[in-house]
Amino acid sequence: METSLHKAPQKRQVTAIIFLLLLWEAGSATITYSVLEETDRGSLVGNLAKDLGLSLRELITRGAQILSKGNKQLLQLEQKSGNLLLKEKLDREELCGSTNPCILHFQVLLKSPVQFIQGEIQLQDVNDHAPEFMEDEILLKILESSLPGAVFPLKIAQDLDVGSNTVQNYTISTNAHFHLLTRNHSDGRKYPELVLDKALDREEQAQIRLTLTAMDSGSPPKTGTTQVVIVVLDINDNAPEFAQGLYEVQVQENSPVGSLVLTVSARDLDAGTHGELSYSLFQSSNQVLQAFEVNTDTGEIRVRKLLDFEEIQSYRMEIEASDGGGLSGKCTVVIHVMDVNDNAPELTMSVLISEIPENSPETIVAIFGISDPDSGDNGKMVCSVQDRLPFLLKPNEENFYTLVTERALDRESRAEYNITITVSDMGTPRLTTQHTITVQVSDINDNAPAFTHTSYTMFVRENNSPALHIGTISATDSDSGSNAHITYSLLPPHDPQLALNSLISINADNGQLFALRALDYEALQAFEFHVGATDGGSPALSSQALVRVVVLDDNDNAPFVLYPMQNASAPCTELLPRAAEPGYLVTKVVAVDRDSGQNAWLSFQLLKTTEPGLFSVWAHNGEVRTTRLLSERDVPKHRLLLLVKDNGEPPHSASVTLHVLLVDGFSQPYLPLPEVARDPAQEDVLTLYLVIALASVSSLFLVSVLLFVGVRLCRKAGETSLGGCSVPEGHFPGHLVDVSGTGTLSQSYQYEVCLTGGTGTNEFKFLKPVLPNFLNEGGYRNTEENSNFRDSLGFS
């Protein structure tokens, strides 16, 4: 490709040709570009994508990057097009000096996977410098006795360009005595020699002035001129001569300014002023003139500025010794600069990834190059990082290294690493360079939230206020950022009957649990559910914990008396035989409390009784017992008021009224069964059963009466006296029980007990007494008392 460069001041056009070369050597590819110096910034060097055989997508995906030696980047890669552009205008003389060819090295880094491709730019010289003489006038003294053919070297011109653009030829102005020859130095430089064609005559012309022109071969060529003044001298027989024509010496590059390098010596056999010598540099380059100086009187060559082996390894110069008569002699001095380990290794960071994911082994952290301009062992380098760090250095081509992770990192264990890269050379003493980089380990969502407990137990007292805070669950996540942001939730309960969403709510941000409504211990003593903690990562991770809510009982239920049932229409009556001993069990009050714990601990107390001191109740089991023997003075009917109280705070109580009927000769206490709650559906069936049973008993009773009457009529025995007692003979049904006692009730009663276990009800039916033929007064009185007794109980 061709690029036209316009230089405004001169209004001329310079054509720059940029071409691409692919070199394949030793199985590796080197991309070589050729660029003219002074090409404008941003100019196209080549299309890197095409030159590498990659598509633009591949070039971007693989993370192509241009690396230059040193810290100065000369090229830039245009990602959207794959073009390689100049980052700045390049000056060959500044970058390479007199070195030819001028080659600038760079590397192409493909990051994924890592691959280095060597590249170089051959910086082509343009003729942007004209030859220039260091002196405006060159003084040359020649003896008039010099013979034709004598050669007189002249000082050279300097041209910073190289190749054909540097000095290629010298010319001298037309004259009658001299012609000019252009010679080649061993280093390739051109120098002029003046050749005498015709003998000189001082008396005829004591001084001759000539114009010396230096010309390069650029396009267009450039020239430089100086004046040569030739002074014709009288005859002088002897010219100065050096002890040797070539001097070679070595000097350390760290030699201080002013240090002695070499002393050259010449002698002149003439006496007087013709034997006095002066020394000077002759036909020397700018580099020599800047680095060394010669003592004109002693011939000592001393260091003029600090030398640098890495810049120039040797100097070649001509030393001229001139006597007072104008004659001179010359010698060549070659100074070799010796390398010392004066340069510490340099580290140039090309790629630095300051944040890497925690779970990726062999992840590229940095790519860097190291260099040491010293030579030999002074330029050999070793590179390392600290021990016990999970990082490895992998060497690449041309002193490039890749720093990678040795294994997967764990941000939760260590979130930051300070890595010190140490580069040491092998010189004596060793010089070291250290570069510290900080690498942050980025988080990935590799840790699920962890609850502080696997299960939580929370207590809430029943009858709580709605929205009551009952407890808090807590989970932690070792990750960071959104990966550690935890959201709490209620998980569906295992029991489908548990309406969890109507009982409990949870704050999704902080895990606080609230009771949505008042809880009832008697309906629900405890329930369990699971809570979940989910982080904000992608994909999200979660965990769960068990929460058990225990409802604490409040004393909100009064005791309930199961037995005896309190029914206003039919008060419960217990029968107590008058012959009962003290401690006789009259009945037992049975009560329950729907509360629990001490709220359900019941105690019994006798509050009120018809006959104080006759009855007592056991506080813990509700048994009503007699406290003494009954007497004739005790009224036959007693009313007891009992209190059933729980142990809650505040306590609740219930009262029960008990009727006790004193009877003579009753051998067993009357133990009515408590009436329990019945299902209305069962009550109809039980009623039917009861009617059937009642009809059966009535029929049996009627048959018994008829049998009894028949037996009485058939008896042939006479009636007994008034003091006797007629006892019916024959078989009595099993439901007729003799209750004859020793007391006041000497008559025989028959009674029917109807007990139905299913209903818990009881009925007593007293029949009329079977009266013998009592004619005495006592028998009448007893009958009257019994009648009164019946009436008081409401029996007929």
Curated annotation (Swiss-Prot):
Q: Which residues lie on this side of the membrane: Extracellular?
A: 30-690
Q: What is this protein identified as?
A: Protocadherin beta-14
| Classification via InterPro entries | Cadherin-like_dom, Cadherin-like_sf, Cadherin_C, Cadherin_CS, Cadherin_N, Protocadherin/Cadherin-CA
UniProt-listed SMART domains: CA
GO terms for biological process, alphabetical: homophilic cell adhesion via plasma membrane adhesion molecules
According to its record, what are the GO cellular component terms?
Answer: plasma membrane
Cell compartments where the protein resides? Cell membrane
What is the disulfide pattern of this chain? C96-C102
The GO terms this record gives for MF are:
calcium ion binding
| Major localisation | membrane
Q: Which residues lie on this side of the membrane: Cytoplasmic?
A: 712-796
Give start and end of each Cadherin domain: 35-133, 138-242, 247-347, 352-451, 456-561, 568-671
Instruction: Explain the purpose of this protein.
Output: Potential calcium-dependent cell-adhesion protein. May be involved in the establishment and maintenance of specific neuronal connections in the brain.
Instruction: Show which residues constitute the signal peptide.
Output: 1-25
Q: What is the lineage of its organism?
A: Eukaryota, Metazoa, Chordata, Craniata, Vertebrata
Which keywords, in A-to-Z order, does the entry hold? Calcium, Cell adhesion, Cell membrane, Disulfide bond, Glycoprotein, Membrane, Repeat, Signal, Transmembrane, Transmembrane helix
**Glycan attachment points:** N169, N184, N418, N567
Q: Which PROSITE patterns match?
A: CADHERIN_1, CADHERIN_2
Q: Which residues cross the membrane?
A: 691-711
Q: Whose protein is this, by species?
A: Mus musculus (Mouse)
Q: Which CDD domains does this entry report, sorted A to Z?
A: CA_like, Cadherin_repeat
Which Pfam families does this entry report, sorted A to Z? Cadherin, Cadherin_2, Cadherin_C_2
Q: How does it sit in the membrane?
A: Single-pass type I membrane protein
Q: Which gene encodes it?
A: Pcdhb14
